């Protein structure tokens, strides 16, 4: 699953499908982690940063998974087409 170290990152990235590839988890998790590591997680900006990331990250993450075409995603789309 997700290898995020920050609690805010874990809560943001725990919702996507479990069919994601490890590489997708690593890359996506590294985005919010890199942002949060620039300041103290316990600081006042941490919750604000995670809240701003939330709404934007959801459609972006789902879109990325589909564009990447992971084996599970392509399998679902091909079976639905036939």
Curated annotation (Swiss-Prot):
Part of the gene cluster that mediates the biosynthesis of the lipopeptide antibiotics leucinostatins that show extensive biological activities, including antimalarial, antiviral, antibacterial, antifungal, and antitumor activities, as well as phytotoxic. The function of lcsM within the leucinostatins biosynthesis has not been identified yet. Induction: Expression is positively regulated by the leucinostatins biosynthesis cluster-specific transcription regulator lcsF. Residues 71-82 have a biased composition (Polar residues). The gene is lcsM. This is Leucinostatins biosynthesis cluster protein M. Residues 34-82 are annotated as: Disordered.
